[in-house]
Swiss-Prot record:
Protein name: Dermaseptin-B5
Similarity-based family: Belongs to the frog skin active peptide (FSAP) family. Dermaseptin subfamily.
Keyword S-adenosyl-L-methionine among record annotations: no
Source organism superkingdom: Eukaryota
Valine amide PTM positions: 26
Length: 26
């Protein structure tokens, strides 16, 4: 459903942001 797509997109965005943050810290 639409809600699952929104949650999936948010999860991917959060994952990318977390990876980017980790890369900046290293």
């Amino acid at each position: 459903g639409l809600w699952n797509k929104i949650k999936e997109a948010a999860s991917k965005a959060a994952g990318k942001a977390a990876l980017g943050f980790v890369n900046e810290m290293v």
